[in-house]
Each structure stands twice: as structure tokens, then as C-alpha cells.
Amino acid sequence: MLNIFSLIWICLNSALYSSGFFFGKLPEAYAFLNPIIDFMPVIPVFFFLLAFVWQAAVSFR
């Protein structure tokens, strides 16, 4: 179980800290989308957490 949490932590850190390294700057016409694009790497984590909430709702059948 510790390995799963370590992997999640590594993925979150790499998504948060290396986003400036892998991606360039948006063109000026799309500058208003910067807050949304900064948030996008975290969205798959919400789907992962939603799976646990869903399973808890159906009593982990």
C-alpha cells in the first residue's frame, strides 16, 4: 500500500513542478486560459478519488 501512495506522490509532484519544463508558453490570444491549463494535470487524480467514493457508496462490492 505504501508503494501506491509513493507513486501517487511522485506523479503529483512531477505534474506540479515539471509543467514549466515540458510545456511552452501559450500564445497571447489564449492567455486567459492559463488558470484552466494549470489545473488540468490534477483532473485525473479526481477521477481516481471518485472511484473510491463510488465503491464506498456501493459498500465495496
Curated annotation (Swiss-Prot):
It is a single-pass membrane protein. GO terms for cellular component: chloroplast thylakoid membrane; photosystem II reaction center. It is found in: Plastid, Chloroplast thylakoid membrane. The keyword 4Fe-4S does not apply. GO terms for biological process: photosynthesis. Belongs to the PsbK family. PSII is composed of 1 copy each of membrane proteins PsbA, PsbB, PsbC, PsbD, PsbE, PsbF, PsbH, PsbI, PsbJ, PsbK, PsbL, PsbM, PsbT, PsbX, PsbY, PsbZ, Psb30/Ycf12, at least 3 peripheral proteins of the oxygen-evolving complex and a large number of cofactors. It forms dimeric complexes. One of the components of the core complex of photosystem II (PSII). PSII is a light-driven water:plastoquinone oxidoreductase that uses light energy to abstract electrons from H(2)O, generating O(2) and a proton gradient subsequently used for ATP formation. It consists of a core antenna complex that captures photons, and an electron transfer chain that converts photonic excitation into a charge separation. This is Photosystem II reaction center protein K. The gene is psbK.
